[in-house]
Swiss-Prot record:
UniProt GO cellular component terms: cytoplasm
Subcellular localization, as worded in the UniProt entry: Cytoplasm
Enzyme Commission designation: 2.3.1.274
Name of the coding gene: plsX
Known function: Catalyzes the reversible formation of acyl-phosphate (acyl-PO(4)) from acyl-[acyl-carrier-protein] (acyl-ACP). This enzyme utilizes acyl-ACP as fatty acyl donor, but not acyl-CoA.
Pathway: Lipid metabolism; phospholipid metabolism
Gene Ontology BP terms: fatty acid biosynthetic process; phospholipid biosynthetic process
Name of the protein described by the UniProt record: Phosphate acyltransferase
Pfam families assigned: FA_synthesis
Catalytic function, reaction form: a fatty acyl-[ACP] + phosphate = an acyl phosphate + holo-[ACP]
Predominant cellular place of this UniProt entry's protein: cytoplasm
Family, per entry: Belongs to the PlsX family.
Length: 335
């Protein structure tokens, strides 16, 4: 049976929402969940304080706080929930890990505990962005604020394999995020990356502007360095929230508008669901030798449930082995 280690102490709403999401996951999936953290706090949110079937508690006495230096905290707090959860994956006691705690700490724990896939210089966080054409991938969204051209090529390769393995997109279109679609546009990084992507065994379609991302037609996988990707991700989240707040204010401003709002309410609910980050669960850290799913710090029960779902799908897909298999072909193309 598949086993998913869940950092029960990580996140703004831990351990309550984490435990709820884990319990919901065992109702839907044939998996075992290992809740990692402080047993007495975890049990407060279990039915009658009892540990149900297919749930196990692994004690971890320490917690990495959000304001701590990630790498230092991971090295110092050997018995923290994120370090212990990562160790379970490394030692084969769990098939994947999920955490809504410090992203930096999870990255550090994953790099130190799981290690990079041989041939991958830097890992990347990949996220699914909602678009008019369904979910599309953006990476890197924060693992590394800076990158070299060869790193972006590796991101493109991993993103392409992930899109095919997890999203079921055949021969995914890969685009390079830029300030214009022309080949000569951009800074030194994008201009140096463009010819490398042209040479790579990918379905590279060229540069993609930021405004094209929400429409989802230009590319299935959009590649950029982590600084830019994180700005795009958080701007998208903020814009979606602001738009829905504005719509709510305007359609309820008068009695007549309120009547009209009733007619469009089902459609608005569908849009809200499509834009809800909790529906997409978590963002995998690609390039490490194990499955490490990074969840939003404010994750609720639904987000944790979906993060566990993503972890399950990653285990089932075997995409890490696919990355290792495809890497030599990409490396040879760059020589």
């Amino acid at each position: 049976m598949m086993r998913i280690a869940v950092d029960a102490m990580g996140g703004d709403h831990a351990p309550a929402e984490i435990v709820k999401g884990a319990l919901r996951s065992i109702e839907q999936f044939d998996i075992e969940v290992i809740l990692v953290g402080q047993p007495e706090r975890i049990k407060e949110f279990l039915p009658q304080g009892e540990v149900p079937a297919r749930v196990r508690i692994k004690e971890a006495t320490e917690v990495v706080e959000m304001d701590e230096h990630p790498a230092q905290a991971v090295r110092r707090k050997k018995d923290s929930s994120i370090v212990v959860a990562t160790r379970l994956v490394k030692e084969g006691e769990a098939d994947a890990l999920v955490s809504a705690g410090s992203t930096g700490a999870q990255m550090a724990a994953s790099l130190l505990g799981l290690g990079r896939i041989k041939g991958i210089d830097r890992p990347a966080i990949v996220t699914v962005l909602p678009t008019l054409e369904g979910g599309k991938l953006l990476l890197d969204v924060g693992a590394n604020p800076d990158a070299k051209p060869e790193h972006l090529v590796q991101y493109a390769m991993m993103g392409s394999i992930y899109a095919e393995s997890i999203l079921g997109i055949q021969n995914p279109k890969v685009g390079l995020l830029n300030i214009g679609t022309e080949e000569t546009k951009g800074n030194e990084l994008t201009q140096a990356t463009y010819p490398l992507l042209q040479k790579a065994p990918l379905n590279f379609i060229g540069n993609v502007e930021g405004r094209a991302i929400p429409y989802g037609q230009a590319a299935d996988v959009v590649v950029c360095e982590g600084f830019v990707g994180n700005v795009v991700l958080k701007t998208t989240e903020g814009l979606a929230g602001a738009l829905f707040q504005l719509i709510k204010e305007k359609i309820t401003a008068t009695p007549l508008r309120k009547l009209g709002a009733l007619a469009i309410k089902p459609g608005l609910k569908e849009i809200a669901k499509m834009m809800d980050y909790a529906e997409y669960g978590g963002a995998p850290l690609l390039g490490v030798h194990g499955i490490s799913i990074i969840s939003h710090g404010s994750s609720n029960e639904k987000a944790i449930f979906n993060a566990i779902r993503v972890a399950k799908e990653c285990v089932e897909s075997g995409f890490i082995e696919e990355i290792k298999k495809e890497l030599p072909r990409f490396t040879a193309a760059q020589e």
